[in-house]
């Protein structure tokens, strides 16, 4: 896939408003990542307004990291509002296979037709109803083990499915792309996976979801590579990563994106 820089340039010029229903651990990090990248975050989650706000935003992201009954109401209301308004929305099924509560929530959100599903291999396997070895929010399965399940999930749900890990895999059920951008320090900072979901939402707001998701993964991963050049550990990496998201140019993204057809 060519032209990732064009996707980034358009996202920054349009600065889409992205409604983020994320978890307690991730909220500040997700907002700062979106701001650094050039989007506009809104952390609107209560059911009293989440559905109405979803029609105002250009995209919605829903993260299952710390669900509670009231937050679940907000998630479902927002997903319905986004669908009614024709807005793209991204599902991040955090630890969806860990408990019966999460499995039920994942199934209900999946029925509300997300535009994109972004998760690690264990989460995608669980959401697709396959056997998984997930450990809470962490994956114990390699990306390659989830590729067939991702394709089936994309076909059955109509969503673009992104399985993220050392080498990411994106599919719409017919096509597939692998993205090799990223750095080993990225999983050592909490909420970066949640933040990636926000970036996917920002790109999906302005481009077709398959191409937008692949471009978002390349952008996020390449920023991680750039940040690692100056970081000495996870703490300095987090600061450098925000700076890299802000500084990465469309031209640099075109040069550095490592995408190939799968």
Curated annotation (Swiss-Prot):
It is an enzyme of class 2 (transferase). Keywords: ATP-binding, Kinase, Magnesium, Metal-binding, Nucleotide-binding, Thiamine biosynthesis, Transferase. Gene3D superfamilies: 3.40.1190.20. GO terms for biological process: thiamine biosynthetic process; thiamine diphosphate biosynthetic process. The lineage of its organism: Bacteria, Pseudomonadati, Pseudomonadota, Alphaproteobacteria, Rhodobacterales. Belongs to the Thz kinase family. It comes from Cereibacter sphaeroides (strain ATCC 17029 / ATH 2.4.9) (Rhodobacter sphaeroides). NCBIfam families: PRK09355.1, thiM. ATP binds at residues 118, 164. It comes from the Bacteria. This is Hydroxyethylthiazole kinase. Substrate binds at residues 43, 191. CDD domains: THZ_kinase (cd01170).
């Amino acid at each position: 896939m060519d032209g990732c820089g064009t996707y980034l340039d358009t996202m920054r010029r349009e600065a889409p408003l992205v409604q983020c229903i994320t978890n307690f651990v991730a909220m500040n990090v997700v907002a700062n990542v979106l701001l650094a990248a050039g989007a506009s975050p809104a952390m609107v989650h209560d059911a009293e307004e989440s559905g109405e706000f979803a029609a105002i935003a250009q995209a919605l992201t829903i993260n299952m990291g710390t669900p509670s009954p009231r937050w679940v109401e907000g998630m479902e209301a927002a997903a319905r509002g986004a669908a009614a308004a024709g807005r793209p929305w991204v599902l991040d099924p955090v630890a969806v296979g860990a408990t019966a509560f999460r499995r039920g929530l994942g199934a209900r959100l999946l029925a509300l037709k997300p535009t994109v599903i972004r998760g690690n291999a264990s989460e995608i396997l669980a959401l697709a109803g396959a056997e998984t070895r997930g450990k809470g929010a962490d994956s114990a399965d390699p990306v390659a083990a989830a590729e067939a399940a991702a394709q089936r999930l994309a076909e059955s749900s109509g969503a673009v499915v992104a399985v993220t890990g050392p080498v990411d895999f994106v599919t719409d059920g017919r096509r597939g792309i692998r993205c090799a951008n990223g750095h080993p320090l990225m999983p050592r900072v909490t909420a970066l996976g949640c933040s990636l979901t926000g970036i996917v939402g920002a790109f999906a707001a302005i481009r077709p979801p398959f191409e937008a998701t692949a471009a978002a993964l390349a952008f996020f991963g390449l920023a991680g590579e750039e940040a690692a050049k100056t970081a000495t550990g996870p703490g300095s990496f987090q600061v450098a990563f925000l700076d890299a998201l802000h500084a990465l140019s469309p031209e640099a993204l075109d040069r550095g994106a490592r995408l190939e057809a799968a």
